[in-house]
Regions:
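Active-site-lining helix/loop region of Rossmann-like oxidoreductase modules
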Residues: 126-187
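Short, conserved loop/helix-junction motifs that constitute active-site signature segments
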Residues: 67-74, 97-99, 121-122
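Rossmann-like NAD(P)-binding element
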Residues: 42-76, 80-83
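Residues at the starts of beta-strands that form the adenosine-phosphate
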Residues: 3, 26, 50, 126, ...
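NAD(P)+-binding Rossmann beta1-loop-alpha1 motif at the extreme N-terminus of oxidoreductases
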Residues: 1-41
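Rossmann-fold NAD(P)-binding glycine/threonine-rich loop
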Residues: 81-120
Length: 187
């Protein structure tokens, strides 16, 4: 069992957090404006966590890390945010505000609907991610029901975000349904 703080109370954080609870993990939900009794303040949630999932609007990442960076020391931080209005989808330039954290990029390339029901036509969806290969992230992705595909260390963040841009284009520009996923096939 892993203790996890889910920062963000929207569809992505709630759906992933509930999947982790069903898998047996201890999950605390946090937001800037906690609504007791279920939601904690961000600092309180981080204090009791080994892993932190960032599931807030992407533009808020720099401020959150500036305020809570020291508290993230020694923790794995999974960045699931997307700043769709920004120049880039991620804010990795803010990661140095939490120098003791180990960052991974995951859960940002599919719609939250795939985290609630991770298969289509009997096929399990793949989730591309990057970050440290020894941080337990693959297990947490599998615990949501997805097949993890690691594309490298955190320096591969733009590769992962390329898959996100593809998903956004297919869904929002081409009109495909949000329950759209990717599958890597090999021979």
């Amino acid at each position: 069992m892993t203790s996890i703080a889910v920062i963000g109370s929207g569809n992505i954080g709630a759906t992933i957090g509930e999947a982790w609870r069903r898998a047996g993990h201890e999950v605390a939900f946090a937001s800037r404006s906690p609504a007791p009794p279920e939601t904690l303040g961000i600092g309180d949630a981080i204090a009791g966590a080994e892993v932190v999932l960032l599931a807030i609007p992407g533009g808020g990442v720099p401020d959150l890390l500036a305020e809570h960076g020291a508290a993230l020391d020694g923790r794995v931080v999974i960045d699931a945010t997307n700043d769709v209005a920004g120049e880039r989808l991620h804010h990795a330039e803010a990661y140095p505000s939490a120098p003791g954290a180990r960052f991974a990029r995951a859960f940002n390339t599919l719609g939250f609907e795939m985290f609630a029901d991770p298969s289509i036509g009997g096929e399990t969806a793949d989730l591309l991610w990057c970050g440290p290969d020894d941080a337990g992230v693959e297990r947490l992705i599998a615990d949501v029901g997805l097949r993890p595909i690691r594309v490298g260390g955190i320096d591969a963040i733009d590769v992962v975000d390329g898959a996100c841009r593809l998903w956004l284009t297919l869904v929002f520009s081409q009109g495909h349904p949000r329950r759209l996923a990717f599958k890597m096939l090999t021979d």
